[in-house]
Design a protein with these regions (language model features):
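Glycan-recognition and catalytic cores of secretory/periplasmic carbohydrate-active enzymes
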Residues: 1-407
Length: 407
């Protein structure tokens, strides 16, 4: 925590990654304690992500990381997993602040992913490459001459609100970076200009789209969008999300697989638990009893297939009878929150819903095992720390050297 960048957000230095697993946990503890020390780093992060070059100012969504410490120059590669967590945190932040700036970025990003990130199966693909025609960022950047020729006198609106210049900010070209909040009197003119630029950009050759639909990421995305639709009271988003859930259900009707396009890829813990999380969220939103039953079945299957009786935790790969060695224990939050913490969260929900003691018993097993390994993994286990607090409200969380008990 002492390495937080108090000006630009996330951690100090470059390259710079959003580290959503940490800031999601931090915002959870802010909502619980109202301690502004937890709120401020999240606000700084989201302000910077939404206004700088890492955010696609024309279409929405963020790139995987920035090469500089001020988020100006992105690596341009767009990943589904990052943006799921970006949408989730933006939703929570908007719900708390009611700041329309963040709502607009949230809606723009959702629209982008629903329009541009779906494959021919109408599921979400995995990523867009950083380069097109062999040049990194070519699809996204603008020369000053190009902007001047396209916009004529209207370029003044762009110059007033975005950091553009003849020298540019990326290899002689310009990445759109907001200067400040756009005045109400210029919003309409600027929106027209941005739409004009977007229409021109869409005529360019796009970066390569990796259209592989991964079960864990699709389930996670749909679960987040389902929650967002409820929080925003957006029936259209809810309806479209449920339509996509039905497509995913059909694909996984016979067997849970990691990648529909390549069934040879091994299935992982996260494929099971994120699908179970989606199903229980669908039950919470729509009182869909079949979804609840499916969630319970998936959770029981997960216990049978992935639970390691020696470590008393889940391993990433399915345990086979003829395995000579157990897979290494993986408790880190990497691209997405760890499957162990997701299982703990769902079992806590299932115990509240069903009052079946099997879920509280499994919770106790996981919590006990977690406490035995936390000192080795804590810096990468923020989703687990957050989930444990949801389950028992008994953790102590430290910020800038001062310990605050969470009851």
């Amino acid at each position: 925590i002492n390495y937080l960048d108090e000006n630009n957000g996330s951690f100090k230095g470059a390259p710079k990654f959003p580290q959503f697993y940490l800031f999601d946990a931090m915002f959870y503890f802010y909502l619980k304690t109202k301690n502004k020390n937890y709120f401020k780093p999240v606000e700084i992060l989201l302000n910077n992500l939404c206004s700088k070059g890492i955010y696609d100012q024309l279409e929405g969504g963020i790139s995987r990381y920035a090469v500089d410490e001020k988020w100006i120059i992105p690596h341009f590669e767009k990943m589904l997993y990052d943006n799921i967590q970006f949408i989730d945190l933006l939703t929570k932040f908007y719900q708390n602040t009611k700041n329309d700036y963040f709502k607009n970025k949230l809606l723009q990003t959702i629209q982008y992913f629903n329009n541009e990130f779906k494959n021919k199966e109408e599921l979400y693909g995995s990523a867009y490459d950083a380069d097109s025609e062999g040049v990194e960022g070519k699809y996204y950047v603008w020369s000053y001459t190009e902007l001047k020729n396209l916009l004529k006198d209207d370029i003044k609106y762009l110059e007033n609100n975005y950091e553009i210049s003849e020298s540019g900010n990326f290899e002689g070209n310009n990445i759109l970076v907001e200067k400040n909040l756009i005045p109400d009197g210029e919003k309409n003119s600027l929106d027209q200009i941005k739409n004009k630029l977007l229409n021109i950009r869409r005529k360019r050759i796009k970066p390569f789209f990796d259209d592989k639909s991964q079960t864990d990421l699709n389930a996670y995305m749909l679960q987040v969008l389902l929650k967002t639709s409820v929080n925003l009271d957006d029936e259209d988003l809810k309806s479209k999300t449920i339509e996509t859930i039905e497509i995913l259900n059909k694909k996984l009707h016979q067997k849970i697989i990691h990648c529909y396009e390549n069934k040879e890829i091994e299935t992982f813990l996260e494929d099971y638990v994120y699908y179970a999380l989606l199903m229980i969220t669908l039950y919470e939103v729509n009182a869909d009893k079949k979804a609840l039953e499916k969630s319970i079945k998936i959770m029981n299957d997960t216990w049978e297939l992935f639970f390691n009786k020696e470590t008393r935790l889940f391993q990433k790969n399915i345990i086979k009878d003829n395995d000579l060695f157990a897979s290494p224990l993986d408790l880190n939050d990497s691209n997405i929150p760890n499957g162990n913490s997701v299982y703990l969260l769902i079992s806590n929900k299932l115990y509240s819903i069903t009052n079946d003691k099997i879920w509280s018993e499994r919770n106790e097993v996981l919590k006990k095992s977690f406490h035995q390994v936390i000192n080795s993994y804590y810096s990468q286990m923020f989703s687990f720390i957050k989930t444990l607090d949801i389950c028992d409200n008994s953790l102590s969380f430290t910020f800038h050297g001062s310990s605050q008990s969470i009851k």
